[in-house]
Amino acid sequence: RDRIERSLYQDNKIDATTKKDADQLLKDAKELDAKADTLKITPKLMLQGSVDLLNEVSTSKITGEEEIYSHTDLYDFKANIEGAQKIYTLFKPELNKKDKKLSADIQKNFDKVNKLLDKYKDGDGYKPYGDVSKADRKALADAVNALGEPLSKMAVITE
């Protein structure tokens, strides 16, 4: 994937190697898609997945090193946040029965993260990650970490 990104965003060319890498990436994606139907996804696994999505943002994506050529890191942030938020939304009715305050805290933290991301919206997408100030990178990391803490407690619904 890195070679494809470099070819597209740094070298500005698509050569035989890029095409070969793209074909392999497509093949791998199709295999993954076929295997996904056979997985048994439990509520506990989904809840852990939501926390893992946030951890990925706060530990690796926030540095800007993942999308070093395309600088599309904010798209990845948003995708991870949306994934975690979808899982929260699915379990929110059950969580509200067990712990309304926790549910409200989670929603408040999602709103904060999304508001920070919205600062960098550009039409239907996002500005390059280089446009994000160091202060906002820290604020975003702090907001994601603040969201992860209550989100990790959502497993209360499986007890």
Spans of features found by a protein language model:
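Mature extracytoplasmic or organellar-lumen-exposed domains after removal of signal/transit peptides
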Residues: R1-E159
